[in-house]
Amino acid sequence: MKIKTIFTVLFTLIAFGLSAQSNTEGETFQLTKQGAHYVFTASINGTADATILVESGIPALLADSAFVFSSGILSDMELTVASKEKLSLAGRVYKITHKANGTVHIGNNTSYIGDVFVLSNYDYGPYEVAVPVMYLHDDLDDGSRIVSLDLGNHSLQMLGKASLNGIKADYSKSNMNTDTYEGMFAIETSMTLDDGIKPRTLSGNFMIDFGNPELLFLLHQTEEVQRFLADNADMELREATTPSGEVVGQFILTKQCQLCSIAFPDAVVVITKNLPLFTTPGNIGLKFFERTHAILDFDQSVVYLKGI
């Protein structure tokens, strides 16, 4: 009887341990939409809270110099003075005052690992820090890089491998790669738009761009887009203009745009010449992620998607 009781207790403890492990959830950050961007507030290195911009296309964690030195958030890192180095972002050029490389703790159980650039006059006020999500690590899951992004519910969560395995069957799966400008992550997929005449398809790499407020930008300079436009010469292209009348691009009004096998009715697809260095045919923007639940597994270069 005593042996049976011992085995029962052991089985219960083992089962509880496995259950606890499988249900371990990473840290969740509540997002706020600020203009055309998403931000969250979290402690940096346990020193001070910062407003943090969610980014996908920057090479390092960026921090405003005035905030860095007034708050002491990077006081434990070895900062090297940068000489005459600059960083161009969204048409603006910032002076890099200091650089570092290492681990920056964000919140309670999340870490950023990589380069750190301290910038002069980096939008101090709206946000103090910007972080590229592909370098966020889950401290509760052996440093895994799996980010669950649910912009519809204003949520960014670090998702453990066990949690992902339990839900990924409910999502469509696409591969990602970094065969792009500056090694940004892109989804290998296709876009099919229906403009009321016929469906038209463009396949290739579509870069993830949280700096793009639209559903999709097509990059005019790429061979794929040039071929797409030539093959669809009957498609109506409308001019995109500024309030002053300056033409800044073109756009296509669609009855439906299907991207990554998810349908977006009455979508607008923008054709731009303003991103001349980008090499992918398309950039997927925030309106896509506001209508989907995306799980980005940067360790395995896979994205799981589900429309909402």
Predicted regions and their residues:
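Bacterial Sec-dependent N-terminal signal peptides
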Residues: 1-25
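Pepsin/retropepsin-fold aspartyl endopeptidases
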Residues: 20-308
